[in-house]
């Protein structure tokens, strides 16, 4: 990555704010999102810098929360060298040792979409990603860029899960994971296993962090992120291992 600071690398970029809209995580609050100008085509260095500032990727868009009077969304990341799996996580790794993994470009694959659609219909029928569609999937998870990857998890050829991940110069960014919702595979905890796999990927690549997106104390759906210890939190400018005070 460039020796320039993240702020120096991004100061000439254009950003836009969305109008206030209902928060997907805290139903009693409104949210506003800061987006990088969609006309910008950020290279690796700019994306690296924005990730250090708490930005995430969704399809072609780089964004972060920018809500008036609310700082509940906190960017979190795992320091790879200091991470030691818990006993339950070690057992999970052993339980999934029979899975085959393969990394692919973040292109559209019909087999992936079919699994994604099953996952959304089964696990998130009450969310804003329902109903699934080809257009929604392409917009969300495909991107023709060298840093964007899809990791497949297969059992004897059967596709069980896919993790969308980005390769940063200073880490791996876990974008989204979807998996087979069948009860037969529940004990595999494929969502957790996908994160453990990305931690090991970062270790092999010599990348110091795995970025998990945002953590919200009041949101139970995000509580799993604190199962990965230690965890670093972005307090606005600095990454620290103490949870910041938020409103």
From Swiss-Prot:
Domain of life: Bacteria
Pfam name, any one: ATE_C
GO MF annotation, one: arginyl-tRNA--protein transferase activity
EC number: 2.3.2.29
Alphabetized UniProt keyword annotations: Acyltransferase, Cytoplasm, Transferase
Name by which UniProt lists this protein: Aspartate/glutamate leucyltransferase
Keyword Disulfide bond listed: no
Source organism of this protein record: Chromohalobacter salexigens (strain ATCC BAA-138 / DSM 3043 / CIP 106854 / NCIMB 13768 / 1H11)
HAMAP family: Bpt
GO CC terms: cytoplasm
GO BP term, pick one: ubiquitin-dependent protein catabolic process via the N-end rule pathway
Similarity comment: family membership: Belongs to the R-transferase family. Bpt subfamily.
Entry keyword annotation includes Cell division: no
The protein's role, per its UniProt record: Functions in the N-end rule pathway of protein degradation where it conjugates Leu from its aminoacyl-tRNA to the N-termini of proteins containing an N-terminal aspartate or glutamate.
Broad EC category: transferase
Compartments in which it is found: Cytoplasm
Catalytic reaction(s) noted: N-terminal L-glutamyl-[protein] + L-leucyl-tRNA(Leu) = N-terminal L-leucyl-L-glutamyl-[protein] + tRNA(Leu) + H(+); N-terminal L-aspartyl-[protein] + L-leucyl-tRNA(Leu) = N-terminal L-leucyl-L-aspartyl-[protein] + tRNA(Leu) + H(+)
């Amino acid at each position: 990555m460039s020796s320039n600071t993240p702020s120096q690398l991004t100061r000439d970029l254009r950003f836009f704010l969305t109008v206030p809209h209902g928060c997907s995580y805290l139903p009693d609050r409104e949210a506003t999102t800061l987006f990088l100008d969609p006309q910008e085509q950020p290279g690796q260095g700019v994306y690296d810098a924005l990730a250090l500032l708490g930005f995430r990727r969704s399809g072609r868009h780089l964004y972060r929360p920018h809500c008036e009077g609310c700082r509940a969304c906190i960017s979190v990341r795992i320091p790879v060298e200091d991470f030691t799996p818990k006993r339950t996580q070690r057992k999970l790794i052993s339980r999934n040792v029979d899975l085959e993994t393969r990394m692919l470009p973040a292109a559209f694959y019909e087999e992936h979409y079919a699994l994604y659609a099953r996952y959304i219909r089964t696990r998130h029928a009450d969310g804003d990603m329902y109903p699934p569609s080809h257009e929604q999937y392409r917009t969300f998870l495909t991107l023709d860029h060298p840093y964007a990857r899809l990791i497949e998890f297969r059992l004897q050829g059967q596709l069980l899960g896919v993790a969308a991940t980005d390769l940063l110069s200073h880490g791996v960014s876990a974008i989204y994971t979807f998996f087979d919702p069948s009860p037969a595979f529940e004990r595999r905890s494929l969502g957790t296993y996908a994160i453990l796999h990305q931690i090991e990927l970062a270790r092999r690549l010599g990348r110091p962090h795995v970025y998990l997106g945002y953590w919200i104390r009041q949101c139970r759906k995000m509580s799993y992120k604190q199962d990965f210890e230690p965890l670093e939190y972005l307090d606005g400018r600095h990454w620290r291992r103490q949870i910041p005070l938020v409103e």
